[in-house]
């Protein structure tokens, strides 16, 4: 199911965070995110957030063998918590069913989703071969969000466009979705996946599925 390390960056982008399988998102048409203005990545706070993520990923990749899987997980846990609004992403991925869940169920889903996401990064970013992770520009969206455009350049010259949708939370900017090749929404994919599980087994089945995925990734498989 998963590729070798040489393909890890591109597969990671395809699977949230793989970054695993997550173009319309958040229940609105993509047309609502029409660009208003372009910015270079230098002074933009949303771009700075993604730059911090990429700096941390490169550091972990270069130290991957010394850190080991658990060490990579521990290093990336605080970085991903600051980069992504994982509670909001969990709620959006669950969709309309969210309001019917109990508070403990909501917390269990957020915890399991966060763990699975972090485990995915730790599992896949397991070495460095000269890849380049580049933040290009930020595009203001009409609803106040920002789209941070980036690319991943493999050593063989393969280029993957990877865009991050960021939203302001208080005084901070957090990523709420990732778009592969500029259009494929990670959250939209997650929402479809979660809906199928919720329909067949309810919230407890979703929690179990997320925990199972996290367990598998943290075992290195």
PLM segments and residue spans:
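N-terminal secretory signal peptides that target proteins for export/translocation
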Residues: 1-18
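Bacterial N-terminal signal peptides
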Residues: 23-35
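Sec/Tat signal peptide C-region and signal peptidase I cleavage site
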Residues: 34-42
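Early exported N-terminus immediately downstream of N-terminal targeting peptides
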Residues: 43-121
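Surface-exposed, polar/charged faces of alpha-helical domains
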Residues: 44-48, 59, 63-71, 100-104, ...
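Surface-exposed, charged secondary-structure patches
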Residues: 118-160, 210-221
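Short beta-strand edge/turn micro-motifs at domain boundaries
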Residues: 159-189
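Low-complexity, intrinsically disordered terminal/linker segments enriched in charged
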Residues: 179-221
């Amino acid at each position: 199911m998963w590729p070798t390390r040489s393909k890890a960056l591109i597969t990671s982008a395809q699977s949230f965070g793989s970054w695993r399988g997550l173009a319309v998102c958040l229940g609105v048409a993509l047309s609502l995110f029409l660009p208003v203005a372009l910015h270079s990545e230098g002074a933009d706070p949303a771009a700075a957030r993604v730059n911090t993520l990429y700096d941390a990923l490169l550091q972990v990749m270069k130290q991957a063998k010394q850190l080991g899987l658990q060490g990579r997980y521990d290093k990336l846990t605080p970085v991903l918590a600051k980069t992504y609004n994982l509670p909001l992403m969990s709620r959006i991925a669950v969709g309309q069913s969210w309001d019917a869940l109990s508070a403990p169920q909501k917390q269990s889903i957020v915890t399991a989703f966060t763990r699975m996401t972090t485990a995915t990064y730790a599992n896949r970013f397991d070495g460095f071969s000269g890849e380049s992770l580049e933040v290009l520009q930020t595009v203001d969206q009409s609803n106040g969000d920002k789209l941070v455009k980036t690319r991943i350049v493999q050593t063989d010259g393969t280029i993957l466009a990877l865009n991050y949708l960021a939203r302001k939370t208080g005084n901070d900017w957090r990523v709420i979705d990732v778009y592969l090749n500029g259009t494929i929404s990670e959250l939209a994919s997650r929402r479809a996946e979660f809906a199928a599980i919720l329909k067949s087994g309810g919230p407890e089945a979703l929690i179990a599925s997320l925990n199972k995925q996290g367990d598998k990734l943290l075992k290195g498989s």
